[in-house]
Amino acid sequence: MAIHNLACVRDERQLFSGLNEEFAPGDGVQIEGSNGAGKTLLLRILAGLTPPDAGEIRWRQRPLRQCRSDYYRELVYIGHRAAIKPVLTPRENLTFYQGITGLRNDYAIYRALEQVGLLGYEDVRAAGLSAGQQQRIALARLWLTSASLWILDEPLTAIDHQGAQALVRLFEQHCATGGMVIMTTHQPLPASRYRMRKVALRMAEATSCFG
């Protein structure tokens, strides 16, 4: 995946411009920046949900506009909103998700719910759960997907330290098998050998480093 000269303007203010990055299989990338720097908007642009004001995204060397169907099959995007069905239970939400992906594995669903701390709530309607618990239902999808590209906005916010450790281990496993993780977080990652490359959005430009 590559982005070329990406720019974003909101309310007549340029959030970032001239953003050039390449993301290769095995990459874990953390987007950094102050509040209002455009981190969430950048993730939405990368997920194909918001058009950039300039620049291009390429997937497997093809412009995104030419391969959207292929791209979306390889993508999991989890934003601030949980994007779940509130009338369904956590178990039913994940069963529904597996149906979309063409898979069905009840054991995997219960294992995913265990990883995000929702065992015991699997048959409670999502509408009766807290916002954080609803977000954890969305995060549980990561244990069920075969998609190669994960774009995640503040995935650590809704989970405790143990859950964060499990999630970081999952990131490490995903990247070790050729997957990619692009995420934002205000929280430090749990101690791990796993290292993410950092892309910092500052003053309408971006810089890269390893952290």
Curated annotation (Swiss-Prot):
ATP binds at G33, S34, N35, G36, A37, G38, K39, T40. Residues 1-211 form the ABC transporter domain. It comes from the Bacteria. It holds the Pfam family ABC_tran. It catalyses: heme b(in) + ATP + H2O = heme b(out) + ADP + phosphate + H(+). It is a peripheral membrane protein. Keywords: ATP-binding, Cell inner membrane, Cell membrane, Cytochrome c-type biogenesis, Membrane, Nucleotide-binding, Translocase, Transport. Part of the ABC transporter complex CcmAB involved in the biogenesis of c-type cytochromes; once thought to export heme, this seems not to be the case, but its exact role is uncertain. Responsible for energy coupling to the transport system. This is Cytochrome c biogenesis ATP-binding export protein CcmA. It comes from Sodalis glossinidius (strain morsitans). The lineage of its organism: Bacteria, Pseudomonadati, Pseudomonadota, Gammaproteobacteria, Enterobacterales.
